[in-house]
């Protein structure tokens, strides 16, 4: 394990979205909001807002989310992180930012687990700015937040193990839903 380095050393970039909300659209690319990023590190796209095709270029001027990017909430609801999946087309919503991992230096899955860790949470908490209405992570300081990460090959091995456990947990959750439904139908 190397000594702490700024998180920016592991990234190709750190970006936030526009500080506004687009006009409502019933279809088009996803406007990724806080509610779409779950506490357990997943994207929930069951209920999404959309941005129109005409407005999309304006909302992706700073960055277009790519598969493997790690999105996170930095204002109001904090400590939510998720990986952008293959096939996602959308833009960052208000109070959402992303880290584009450098695959030579960091495994995207390991980075997600690191961001969800208690030690990262405590470190972020020490930098949170408490506002009159909401708390926020100062994005201008985020790139310099310290991170002590192992070599990328070790990260991959750890992420493989943790991902396997996450898959088992998710599979068990689905089974529980099916069993509960079967029990309801029987009784």
Regions found by a protein language model. Give the residues of each.
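A short beta-sheet element
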Residues: 33-34, 53-116, 120
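A short glycine-rich beta-alpha junction/loop motif
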Residues: 90-97, 109, 129-159
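Flexible, active-site-proximal loop/turn residues at the rims of small-molecule/cofactor binding pockets
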Residues: 38, 77, 151
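Non-catalytic DNA-recognition/assembly elements of restriction-modification systems
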Residues: 1-18, 144-187
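A generic structural signal for short beta-strands and their flanking turns/coil linkers
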Residues: 28, 47, 93-95
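Low-complexity, Lys/Gly-biased intrinsically disordered segments
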Residues: 1-43, 53-60
């Amino acid at each position: 394990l190397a000594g702490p380095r700024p998180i920016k050393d592991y990234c190709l970039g750190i970006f936030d979205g526009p500080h506004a909300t687009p006009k409502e659209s019933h279809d088009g690319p996803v406007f990724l909001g806080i509610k779409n990023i779950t506490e357990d590190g997943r994207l929930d796209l069951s209920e999404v807002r959309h941005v129109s095709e005409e407005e999309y270029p304006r909302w992706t001027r700073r960055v277009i989310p790519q598969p493997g990017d790690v999105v996170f909430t930095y204002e109001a609801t904090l400590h939510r992180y998720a990986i952008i999946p293959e096939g996602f087309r959308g833009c960052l919503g208000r109070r959402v930012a992303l880290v584009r991992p450098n695959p030579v230096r960091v495994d995207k899955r390991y980075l997600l687990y690191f961001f969800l860790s208690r030690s990262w949470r405590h470190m972020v908490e020490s930098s949170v700015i408490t506002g009159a209405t909401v708390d926020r992570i100062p994005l201008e300081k985020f790139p310099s937040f310290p991170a002590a990460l192992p070599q990328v090959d070790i990260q991959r091995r750890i992420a493989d193990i943790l991902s396997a456990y996450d898959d088992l947990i998710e599979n068990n959750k689905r089974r529980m839903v099916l069993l509960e439904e079967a029990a309801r139908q029987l009784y």
